[in-house]
From Swiss-Prot:
Keywords: Ribonucleoprotein, Ribosomal protein, RNA-binding, rRNA-binding. Residues 223-278 are annotated as: Disordered. The keyword rRNA-binding applies. Belongs to the universal ribosomal protein uL2 family. One of the primary rRNA binding proteins. Required for association of the 30S and 50S subunits to form the 70S ribosome, for tRNA binding and peptide bond formation. It has been suggested to have peptidyltransferase activity; this is somewhat controversial. Makes several contacts with the 16S rRNA in the 70S ribosome. The gene is rplB. One of its GO terms (biological process) is cytoplasmic translation. GO terms for molecular function: rRNA binding; structural constituent of ribosome; transferase activity. Transmembrane segments: none annotated. Part of the 50S ribosomal subunit. Forms a bridge to the 30S subunit in the 70S ribosome. This is Large ribosomal subunit protein uL2. One of its GO terms (cellular component) is large ribosomal subunit. It comes from Methylobacterium nodulans (strain LMG 21967 / CNCM I-2342 / ORS 2060).
Amino acid sequence: MALKTFKPVTPSLRQLVIVDRSELYKGKPVKALTEGKISSGGRNNLGRVTVRFRGGGHKRTLRNVDFKRREHAGKVGTVERIEYDPNRTAFIALVTYEGGAQSYILAPQRVKAGDKVVSGDSVDIKPGNAMPIGNMPVGTIVHNVELKIGKGGAIARSAGNYAQIVGRDQGYVTLRLNSGEQRLVHGQCYATVGAVSNPDHMNISLGKAGRKRWLGRRPHNRGVAMNPIDHPHGGGEGRTSGGRHPVTPWGFPTKGKKTRSNKRTDTFIVSSRHNRKK
């Protein structure tokens, strides 16, 4: 889908660039595949703010998206329509399987209403089909990749995202991610062929602060603009750079500080995403 720009009849329209969603389905989602979603406003179960600068925004209905693609394995599904989902950057596709069962899946690029999709151990290599990643040829573009067998897709799920199979060895597949990282994934983990829809999402410009508020994002004020009581970067006469390496409001290093602590899975990372920056 293309991008939309507007004549600058108002200041906010001058900068506005959004994705043209005129081809998407304009009705409501399938009620059986949805559930209510209560906005947390960035608060936890104690009512304390755990994520700053969140709150407000439009009320959303949660669409139950099938990330596993195993329940209807072997059944041919027909894409009924492509829909907008307010809970993610990608579009979703409503699929009706043989027997009448329906589910939502992440809509891949170049998949449209009327197309057939299927999942199973040995299916055709075409966008929208899901199978164990070990059964795909080297060079295949994939998305919605599982990290644990049967747990559901975890890698390459956002708009325009994908990973590429670059090798295969001893039951594991080597994937190259968009970040540059190369990672081992078990060959029995499911993945879907193709790239995720809505690749133009990266080019949008919201044009005004209010549009960010509609998405549930509140103003993000900088530490250097605060008083010393409120932030380690606060205070000083006139504009300052903070006077120290960037830290969080609680004094922990940030902006470049490595935070990965899951050493148990380090063995699956063949090449770190940081290597290409050296």
